[in-house]
Curated annotation (Swiss-Prot):
The lineage of its organism: Eukaryota, Viridiplantae, Streptophyta, Embryophyta, Tracheophyta. There are 6 glucose-6-phosphate 1-dehydrogenase genes in A.thaliana. This is Glucose-6-phosphate 1-dehydrogenase 5, cytoplasmic. D-glucose 6-phosphate binds at residues 183, 213-217, 251, 270, 361, 366, 397. Forms homodimer. It is found in: Cytoplasm, Cytosol. Catalyzes the rate-limiting step of the oxidative pentose-phosphate pathway, which represents a route for the dissimilation of carbohydrates besides glycolysis. The main function of this enzyme is to provide reducing power (NADPH) and pentose phosphates for fatty acid and nucleic acid synthesis which are involved in membrane synthesis and cell division.
Amino acid sequence: MGSGQWHMEKRSTLKNDSFVKEYNPVTETGSLSIIVLGASGDLAKKKTFPALFNLFHQGFLNPDEVHIFGYARSKITDEELRDKIRGYLVDEKNASKKTEALSKFLKLIKYVSGPYDSEEGFKRLDKAILEHEISKKTAEGSSRRLFYLALPPSVYPPVSKMIKAWCTNKSDLGGWTRIVVEKPFGKDLESAEQLSSQIGALFEEPQIYRIDHYLGKELVQNMLVLRFANRLFLPLWNRDNIANVQIVFREDFGTEGRGGYFDEYGIIRDIIQNHLLQVLCLVAMEKPISLKPEHIRDEKVKVLQSVIPIKDEEVVLGQYEGYRDDPTVPNDSNTPTFATTILRINNERWEGVPFILKAGKAMSSKKADIRIQFKDVPGDIFKCQNQGRNEFVIRLQPSEAMYMKLTVKQPGLEMQTVQSELDLSYKQRYQDVSIPEAYERLILDTIRGDQQHFVRRDELKAAWEIFTPLLHRIDKGEVKSVPYKQGSRGPAEADQLLKKAGYMQTHGYIWIPPTL
């Protein structure tokens, strides 16, 4: 262990049973039909089906109740779909342990082919679902239908119409119909509101689950617990003690294979306006009156509505060199592959504290983290401020971890200071615990009817209100992207903006993950 780490013994994890009883939704019985629309696409193969398999393998999907349907335009058989997804469900290391479960899971999958705007296709889908419900003796319980739209947003309206017209729950004994829609939810405020109105005319808000997989990440979900269950942070979490907040997303690869798609959206629409802004809400929100989903989402909306308009001088856009070499990208593209923007929240807790949102592709590393940087110690008698400030870092990926950067005495005979850390690395503390993937958690929440980690319509609207004016200026070429080298930290102008915002970088400090 490093000199500044906590000593963490392996011990049983204590659970608060009263919390579990109060906030876990009641388990329902009856048939459960999970319909994956866009079943032959990359999202379904790489994320949706693997998440469903892991839930099945862990016992969260009862084979006596559940059946999974794939729907897409591809004319393939049940077995061909199973073959397409088989390789994504288990890795070589765990294949032998999961052979039996994999076989049982694949047998639950049935495929229906048809267009996304065709009555006949959805009538066939409904017939297949009804046959499943009858075989599962739905008369003994409710009929539940979950539609996962692993599709481009352009087909959400026609698909939603077909589901509403032909495929909703028909049981007299209760149950539900729910739809899950993926980002992007529009390209700006107007298109997002239009999409919301089209879907909202067909389904009630409690039926609509707008998924942002960042809200399913373990340490993102930990944010409310960290803030409101630990007395340590309560008096510190404000403008009197915090100098700035940085929320960072980096990828070490470019847009290979999807340059044309990415060029329509850019890094702000792809990452910052949704993923990073959702994290900001959890960092900045006030304590909700309870853990009910609506109370939490009410507080998130208040944060978004308190963000003042973004200033162009507090934005740096970048585009990595070689991006336009992709034949699907226009030669004169101004689409940013990197952006740093400062958001400011006009309320009593956060006035004057810059929230720095930063995301980029083709950078020097792949990671995502939250950095809460505290102010300097007043009257510093050790003269050590140039070594760096206290900083609470939450590493979202890879290798989930939390650590607090502290100044301590360096071991030895002299009174010298050095930066170290108090460290909680999840892989060390929870060696025997399987940390679920974000999609597993969110799909399970959907089945349970828990909307806490999904985006509400007014929340979506408020998020687009923040970024739409800036995005329109970028689209018109009024804010330019500057070039940066692949494998770098991004444009130098971004570091200058951070310095101007008051972020103090700790030069020479490197966090070393503990050895297991």
